[in-house]
């Protein structure tokens, strides 16, 4: 299964950061720095776990979407992309 939405989402994240609009959640999150973004990724990961244990499949999907979005912002803030993660996964499969 190909999930091209990640490429689109990465492009939107880059665009929102480049625009520098303080009304944009993405821009504000990015501007808050790696430490804050990393904490947010941790919070979202916990929310996925809680949803898996107590809230049902729909909530797991919703919280997973939040986690993936925040992870993409974190990767961007470190000068990385999902492509870098994909390369590592491909390397591990060899």
UniProtKB/Swiss-Prot annotation:
One of its GO terms (molecular function) is phosphoribosyl-ATP diphosphatase activity. Keywords: Amino-acid biosynthesis, ATP-binding, Cytoplasm, Histidine biosynthesis, Hydrolase, Nucleotide-binding. One of its GO terms (cellular component) is cytoplasm. It is an enzyme of class 3 (hydrolase). Its EC number is 3.6.1.31. The gene is hisE. This is Phosphoribosyl-ATP pyrophosphatase. The keyword Aminoacyl-tRNA synthetase does not apply. It is found in: Cytoplasm. One of its GO terms (biological process) is L-histidine biosynthetic process. Pathway: Amino-acid biosynthesis; L-histidine biosynthesis; L-histidine from 5-phospho-alpha-D-ribose 1-diphosphate: step 2/9. Pfam families: PRA-PH. InterPro entries: HisE (IPR008179), PRib-ATP_PPHydrolase-like (IPR021130).
